[in-house]
A protein has these predicted regions:
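Non-ligating segments of multi-cofactor redox enzymes
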Residues: 1-126
């Protein structure tokens, strides 16, 4: 890859794979693609987990329930420093936190409509 997308990313959120990760690894998750050396990528918020949750809900003929899909980072963080949810649901925790006076988005002035929201230090959650 030429890495021009890395230079253009306003968030510096792209990573370049310098190594070859294509070796046989019996422990690899078959649902997660492993990009070859020379490819730029960024976090997908575990899109494969979202797809699985959608497929499960569709097979069961129901809507996805809140919390049914959580990226691995949100699931693994014991401090709950990463909260994930539906911003379009005003009752969701993530939606309430997004409306907090502590909430801010990076590079919002560039018109990129960021969906990752950060909270400044302060009292409790939202």
């Amino acid at each position: 890859g030429c890495r021009f997308c890395m230079a253009a990313c306003p968030y510096n959120a792209k990573y370049f794979n310098w190594r070859l990760y294509q070796k046989e690894a019996p422990g690899q998750n078959p649902d997660v693609s492993v990009r070859p050396k020379g490819v730029v990528e960024k976090c997908t918020f575990c899109h494969h987990r979202l797809q699985k949750a959608r497929e499960r809900a569709l097979a069961e003929k129901r809507e996805m329930s809140p919390g049914e899909y959580v990226p691995a980072c949100g699931e693994a963080c014991p401090a709950r420093a990463i909260i994930f949810g539906d911003l379009s649901d005003p009752a969701s925790e993530v939606s309430r936190l997004a409306k907090s006076p502590r909430a801010f988005r990076l590079q919002e002035e560039l018109g990129t409509k960021p969906k990752v929201i950060y909270l400044t230090e302060g009292e409790g959650r939202g």
